[in-house]
């Protein structure tokens, strides 16, 4: 009997996956326990941040009896929960944003070139995996890594590029961005500058 063709089954197991390379960062690992009839069952919980360092980032939490399995589960979950964040010049945020989750509150500010990543712990991992090179941030609420990451991602979801803002308002990008002139224009001519003696 001839073998039947696999038509649409297996969800492309034989097909090579064309996924971009992701970097991951282990943020926290905790020992957890579950009380069962015979006593306590111990395991590990891992918190992992994953990103392509070009504007996509996600995080995941995994639990297992062994550390490597917990990290693997967390990494897989993080890859399924990726969000895309528009970056200004591929290095910083377009505008200042705030984020919160539970008791976690964070403030993130755009920064000039050469500033570096001014952020602590879990927030730094998110920015590094996202590909941000210049940012100033502060966490004012809960220092729990889970809440800090969720608050950071909440703020990053509200990040918009000038193009996105212009399309929402039905305007051109030039109308949204401020003019870079030193002096205001009056009917096409530069306004006189008053000199005080």
From Swiss-Prot:
According to the record, the residues making up region (Disordered) are 1-22, 158-197
UniProt GO MF annotations: rRNA binding; structural constituent of ribosome
| Ribonucleoprotein among keywords | yes
**Record-stated family:** Belongs to the universal ribosomal protein uS5 family.
What role does this protein play? With S4 and S12 plays an important role in translational accuracy.
The domain section of the record reads: The N-terminal domain interacts with the head of the 30S subunit; the C-terminal domain interacts with the body and contacts protein S4. The interaction surface between S4 and S5 is involved in control of translational fidelity.
The name of this protein is Small ribosomal subunit protein uS5
Q: Which gene encodes it?
A: rpsE
């Amino acid at each position: 009997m001839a073998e039947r063709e696999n038509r649409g089954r297996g969800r492309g197991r034989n097909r090579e996956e064309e996924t971009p390379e992701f970097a991951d960062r282990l943020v926290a690992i905790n020992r957890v326990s579950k009380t069962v009839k015979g006593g306590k069952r111990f395991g590990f919980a891992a918190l992992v941040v994953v990103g392509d360092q070009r504007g996509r980032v996600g995080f995941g939490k995994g639990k297992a009896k062994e550390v490597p399995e917990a990290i693997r589960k967390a990494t897989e979950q993080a890859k399924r929960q990726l969000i895309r964040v528009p970056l200004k010049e591929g290095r910083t945020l377009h505008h200042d944003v705030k984020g919160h989750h539970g008791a976690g509150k964070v403030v993130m500010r755009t920064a000039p070139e050469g500033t570096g990543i001014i952020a602590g712990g879990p927030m730094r991992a998110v920015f590094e995996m996202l590909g941000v090179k210049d940012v100033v941030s502060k966490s004012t609420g809960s220092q729990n890594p889970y809440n800090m990451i969720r608050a950071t991602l909440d703020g990053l979801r509200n990040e918009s590029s000038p193009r996105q803002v212009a399309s929402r308002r039905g305007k051109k990008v030039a109308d949204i961005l401020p003019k870079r002139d030193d002096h205001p224009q009056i009917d096409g001519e530069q306004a006189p500058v008053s000199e005080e003696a």
